[in-house]
């Protein structure tokens, strides 16, 4: 009788473990050569390795839609620039049609597993275009992102901050989906590009096959000015300075700056889930992320060691700067079990 009971318990445990290991989750992210793309793909790898879940990842998505899909329970995980929950909560920009009540309701359904710097917005052009930098935007055609979403919102804001120009009045904007970005950069559709960048950036590296590129830093006076400081206070935006020598380019790229630093607005975000995700699942996913930081996440692409994965300091995560979403309780448990401190304002 004792033997039968023991065997029964073992069988039950095995079935429970098997069911947990075979959990299938869905995830949406940006292009696979971007920080959000690599990050979510890495999560699928560490989740499988830890036998937490099988995550089916769809890349090349517009994250505006992906974040809403998570809030509505249509997708389990999405990469989310933190500006998007802010826009959703206010029902403005790409979420204007939701209405404030619906937007606030959807935002209340979002929670964070971990954060990272998605990109630093910047201006660049092929040397062959004879483009003159920030002072030369007027009257030009600028590729500034996909048809809707955080990248386009941030690009328009950055151009207005630097030049005072608005799309359609001072310059012509070109938008295409991320899957067509490299082609659009290379085919001459635009004079210059104001896009999210990693260091080194995959799109720029691919574009070098068509010629040398120049990147323009934000002018120091603009970076230190009152207007930019206001922009830096927008949830999901942090000021970034980086030594040009650490940007990761070995040739074909010139960086224009008054000194040896690149300056720009950084976009931070993270992997979001629905608040209704099981506590143990959120904890297991976050634990798998923490355990895979060095051998998976930071080793996955040249720009990943530069992307602030594994940070919990709110100066880098921007979790409490008007950000309407918090960490999932399961994620908090995983972080704290691993010895990290999560600020109370982010719980």
Model-derived regions, located:
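Ligand-binding clefts/hinges and TM-proximal coupling segments of bilobed small-molecule sensing domains
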Residues: 133, 138-157, 235-284, 288-311
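An extracytoplasmic/periplasmic, membrane-proximal ligand-sensing/linker region
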Residues: 25, 39, 197-211, 215-223, ...
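Cleavable N-terminal signal peptides
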Residues: 8-9, 19
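Bilobed "Venus flytrap"/periplasmic-binding protein-like clamshell domains
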Residues: 22-56, 119-187, 198-201, 325-330
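N-terminal segment of the mature folded domain
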Residues: 71-115
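Bacterial N-terminal signal peptides that target proteins for export
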Residues: 1-7
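Sec/Tat signal peptide C-region and signal peptidase I cleavage site
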Residues: 15-21
């Amino acid at each position: 009788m004792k033997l039968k009971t023991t065997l029964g318990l073992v069988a039950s445990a095995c079935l429970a473990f098997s069911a947990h290991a075979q959990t299938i989750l869905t995830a949406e992210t940006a292009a696979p050569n971007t920080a959000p793309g690599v990050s979510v793909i890495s999560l699928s790898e560490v989740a499988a390795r830890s036998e937490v879940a099988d995550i089916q990842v769809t890349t090349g998505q517009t994250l505006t839609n992906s974040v809403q899909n998570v809030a509505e329970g249509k997708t389990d995980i999405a990469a989310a620039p933190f500006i998007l929950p802010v826009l959703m909560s206010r029902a403005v920009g790409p979420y204007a049609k939701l209405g404030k009540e619906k937007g606030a309701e959807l935002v209340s359904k979002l929670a964070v597993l971990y954060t990272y710097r998605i990109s630093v917005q910047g201006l660049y052009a092929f040397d062959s275009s004879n483009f003159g930098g920030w002072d030369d935007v007027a009257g030009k055609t600028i590729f500034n992102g996909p048809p809707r979403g955080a990248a386009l919102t941030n690009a328009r804001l950055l151009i207005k901050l630097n030049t005072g120009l608005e799309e359609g009045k001072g310059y012509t904007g070109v938008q295409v989906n991320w899957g067509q970005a490299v082609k659009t950069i290379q085919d001459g559709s635009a004079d210059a590009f104001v896009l999210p960048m990693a260091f080194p950036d995959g799109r720029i590296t691919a574009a070098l096959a068509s010629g040398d590129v120049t990147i323009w830093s934000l002018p120091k006076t603009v970076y230190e000015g009152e207007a930019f400081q206001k922009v830096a206070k927008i949830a999901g935006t942090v000021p970034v300075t980086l030594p040009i020598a650490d940007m990761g380019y070995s040739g074909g790229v010139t960086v224009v700056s008054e000194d040896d630093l690149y300056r720009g607005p950084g976009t931070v975000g993270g992997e979001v889930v629905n608040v209704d995700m099981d506590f143990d699942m959120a904890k297991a996913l976050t634990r798998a992320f923490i355990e895979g930081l060095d051998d998976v996440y930071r080793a996955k692409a040249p720009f990943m060691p530069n992307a602030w994965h594994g940070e919990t300091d709110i100066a880098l995560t921007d979790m409490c700067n008007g950000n309407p979403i918090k960490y999932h309780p399961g994620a908090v448990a995983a972080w704290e079990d691993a010895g990290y401190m999560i600020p109370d304002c982010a719980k």
